[in-house]
Amino acid sequence: MQVNISGHQLDVTDALRDYVEEKISRLERHFDRITSVQVIMTVEKLKQKIEATLHVSGAEVVANAEHEDMYAAIDLLADKLDRQLIKHKEKQIERQQGQRPADSPVP
């Protein structure tokens, strides 16, 4: 998985980078087909904003979060992405189960 982290009006420190990478790597326990991740952190007045785009097999998962503290915003973002990935995985499973032929023939 390729992780690209950038900051707008913000210097991305090693501590921030490590924290984001740790949170993103935890997402793989639910969905292991994440190919790349784009994370953009911005500062606007008193708000810390973070946006992430995950490229997964067959789709893109996008989430945004904002908070007064960047670390709290990262936590919120990770929670949102976690829920979205679980939902995406469930949809994929439903599609696969719907495509299988029925066990018994229809009369």
Swiss-Prot record:
Cell membrane listed as a keyword: no
Annotated keywords: Translation regulation
One of the protein's GO biological processes: negative regulation of translational elongation
Annotated InterPro entries: HPF/YfiA_ribosome-assoc, RHF-like, RHF/RaiA
GO molecular function terms attached to this record: ribosomal small subunit binding
Example of a GO cellular component annotation carried by this entry: cytosolic small ribosomal subunit
Domain of life: Bacteria
One Pfam family it belongs to: Ribosomal_S30AE
Subunit structure: Associates exclusively with 100S ribosomes, which are dimers of 70S ribosomes.
UniProt similarity note: Belongs to the HPF/YfiA ribosome-associated protein family. Short HPF subfamily.
Biological role stated in the UniProt entry: During stationary phase, promotes and stabilizes dimerization of 70S ribosomes by the ribosome modulation factor (RMF), leading to the formation of inactive 100S ribosomes.
Descriptive protein name: Ribosome hibernation promoting factor
Species in which this protein is naturally found: Azotobacter vinelandii
Gene name, Swiss-Prot/TrEMBL: hpf
